[in-house]
Structures are given as structure tokens and as C-alpha cells.
């Protein structure tokens, strides 16, 4: 397994590219990406991880901010290039960007797996989108990881 964190460049690979889409809200969301990376360490894949070590929470979230624009564009490119997208909706967060990303990619035909535990504030919306587009939805991160290994 190879992990590529934002904003490092990436290209197509022989092994599947897996994008980790999900709650990142600092101070609220668990670092679920670390758990996925550790669990997939022995798999033949490249993980595209938007959680960056040098994240600046004070950066203005405006298109005119080059730092912010770089992050958003990296994520959009990674979502488009990914063979598999893993979504995780942490019940302690709102995750509006993750909801948007699911909406953008639900119909693409990409292999998508969603983990939306009980307690997520818009779980019903996520359930309906997954049912409509034939996307597998699970309740725990462990189930998400297990199903991801099967897809790889």
C-alpha cells in the first residue's frame, strides 16, 4: 500500500486508487483515515488521503486563497481519478463537503462504499441516496474496511 496525502501529486497506478472521503472536522471527527490506512497496509493499493499534515485551520476558505484552492482542487481530482471511494460520515460531525461529494459521485459508476453510523444527522438522506444508486452502505468503520479489502 502506498499513501499519498494532499497536496502531493498522484497519477494512475496499476493498483487501485482509493480516495478517503469523509468527516475531517478538526476537534470533532475521529482520525478515521489513520485506521483505514493501517488496516489496508498489506493491500495492493494507493490511498489518496485528503487529511494533510500541514493543515492550517486558520486559512480562509475562499477560492482566492491559493492554499485553500490547492486543497479543494486536489480533492476534486482525487475523487475523479479514484477507482474506489470510501465515504465515512462521523456521527459527531455535519460533514457538508462529504455529503456534497457523495452527491457528485453517486451516479458515476465508480466503486463506492459508504459508512454512515446511527446518529449521523442526515443518515436518512445518505440511506436514500445509497439505495437509489445501488451503493453499499454499512454501519461501522470495521465493515467499511472489510468490504474495501474485498473490492481491492
Please give the residue ranges for each predicted region.
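Conserved catalytic or regulatory cores that recognize and/or transform ribose-phosphate-containing ligands
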Residues: 1-152
Amino acid at each position: 500500500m502506498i499513501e499519498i496525502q494532499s497536496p502531493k501529486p498522484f497519477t494512475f497506478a496499476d493498483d487501485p486508487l482509493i480516495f478517503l472521503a469523509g468527516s475531517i472536522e478538526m476537534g470533532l471527527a475521529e482520525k478515521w483515515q489513520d485506521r483505514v490506512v493501517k488496516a489496508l497496509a498489506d493491500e495492493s493499493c494507493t490511498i489518496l488521503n485528503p487529511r494533510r499534515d500541514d493543515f492550517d485551520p486558520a486559512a480562509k476558505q475562499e477560492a482566492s486563497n491559493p492554499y485553500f484552492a490547492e486543497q479543494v482542487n486536489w480533492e476534486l481530482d482525487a475523487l475523479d481519478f479514484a477507482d474506489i471511494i470510501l465515504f465515512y460520515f462521523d456521527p459527531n460531525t455535519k460533514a457538508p463537503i462529504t455529503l456534497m461529494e457523495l452527491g457528485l459521485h453517486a451516479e458515476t459508476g465508480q466503486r463506492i462504499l459508504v459508512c454512515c453510523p446511527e446518529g449521523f444527522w442526515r443518515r436518512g438522506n445518505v440511506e436514500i441516496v445509497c439505495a437509489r444508486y445501488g451503493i453499499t452502505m454499512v454501519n461501522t468503520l470495521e465493515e467499511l474496511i472489510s468490504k474495501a479489502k474485498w473490492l481491492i
